[in-house]
């Protein structure tokens, strides 16, 4: 059986992305046919910064039509508009290749959101771009590993804005799309307020969540969604035995327990998209860039998910 062709966007080159590419290539090449969306010259510079620890000649790299950012000992670990623009163009090229079915899926390495902002990229990050590119699809950010997956009803929005987003019909649409994409038989839904609202004592959002759960289960014809569960106990061991699938109303409520338990191995999956896209579940790690300290478990798991 032929190996799948995977486009790998480079992420912010001032972070750990290029180290992950170089140190993981042999393992990645065993799972798939990787196409690295980065100029070969930058891979060579990265290897020099890593004391020429890796072999670069066999890597299949595709040049990006964007000015090459500086990459040297004085730029690493620093936010740069040039690096932001380059990482965006690498990601956009990956999407174009997936749209034209020249690759089977894409794996995105971490970007710096402030670098995108400085480069005047009009998107908060990868998922925001996908939501705009594929507007007819409800793109869902799900993070996790085989032991625990968390779907985010809201992702990169201020916590103060989440309450207004929690509306019954919007949540029903989200829940049904999440179930369709994951084929989960049971999904536990975290509440929004302390004690899941305590029957309206601590806010009305959880009453909306309950109505959305009831309507979604009725549509499906079985009791798929459980909750809303008090979020402070939703991830207790006895709860995680029920199902690995969860939904959180906000970013940190769902991801804090996930990363406490499975930070190194978790991945980021864009559900319900017309293309297959996964990412590492960590940032650029500027503080350890080009020190040969980057853990590649999340990256390898992302590749395995696609392959």
UniProtKB/Swiss-Prot annotation:
Its cofactor is Zn(2+); Mg(2+); Co(2+). The keyword Manganese does not apply. Homodimer. Belongs to the PdxA family. The keyword Zinc applies. NCBIfam families: pdxA, PRK03946.1. It catalyses: 4-(phosphooxy)-L-threonine + NAD(+) = 3-amino-2-oxopropyl phosphate + CO2 + NADH. Its main location: cytoplasm. Pathway: Cofactor biosynthesis; pyridoxine 5'-phosphate biosynthesis; pyridoxine 5'-phosphate from D-erythrose 4-phosphate: step 4/5. It comes from Helicobacter pylori (strain P12). One of its GO terms (molecular function) is NAD binding. This is 4-hydroxythreonine-4-phosphate dehydrogenase. GO terms for biological process: pyridoxal phosphate biosynthetic process; pyridoxine biosynthetic process. The active site is located at the dimer interface. One of its GO terms (cellular component) is cytoplasm. It is found in: Cytoplasm.
């Amino acid at each position: 059986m032929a190996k799948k062709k995977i486009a790998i966007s480079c992420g912010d080159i001032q972070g750990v992305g290029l180290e992950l590419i170089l140190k993981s290539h042999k393992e990645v090449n065993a799972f798939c046919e990787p196409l690295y969306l980065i100029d070969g010259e930058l891979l060579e510079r990265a290897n020099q910064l890593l004391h020429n620890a890796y072999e670069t000649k066999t890597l299949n790299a595709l040049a990006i039509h964007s000015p090459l950012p500086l990459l040297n000992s004085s730029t690493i670990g620093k936010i740069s508009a040039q690096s932001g623009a380059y990482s965006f163009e690498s990601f956009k090229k990956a999407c174009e290749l997936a749209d034209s079915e020249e690759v089977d899926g894409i794996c995105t390495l971490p970007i710096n959101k402030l670098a995108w902002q400085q480069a005047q990229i009009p998107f908060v990050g990868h998922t925001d771009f996908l939501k705009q590119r594929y507007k007819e699809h409800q793109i869902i950010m799900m993070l996790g590993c085989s032991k625990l997956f968390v779907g985010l009803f809201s992702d990169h929005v201020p916590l103060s804005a989440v309450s207004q987003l929690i509306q019954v019909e919007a949540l029903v649409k989200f829940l049904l799309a999440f179930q369709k994409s994951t084929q989960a038989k049971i999904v536990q839904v975290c509440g929004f307020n302390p004690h899941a609202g305590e029957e309206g004592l601590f806010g009305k959002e959880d009453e909306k969540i309950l109505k959305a759960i009831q309507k979604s289960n009725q549509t499906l014809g079985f009791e798929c969604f459980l909750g809303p569960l008090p979020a402070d106990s939703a991830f207790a061991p006895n709860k995680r035995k029920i199902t690995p699938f969860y939904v959180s109303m906000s970013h940190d409520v769902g991801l804090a327990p996930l990363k406490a338990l499975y930070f190194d191995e978790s991945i980021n999956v864009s559900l319900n998209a017309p293309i297959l896209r996964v990412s590492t579940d960590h940032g650029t790690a500027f503080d350890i860039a080009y020190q040969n300290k980057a853990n590649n478990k999340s990256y390898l798991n992302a590749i395995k998910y696609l392959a």
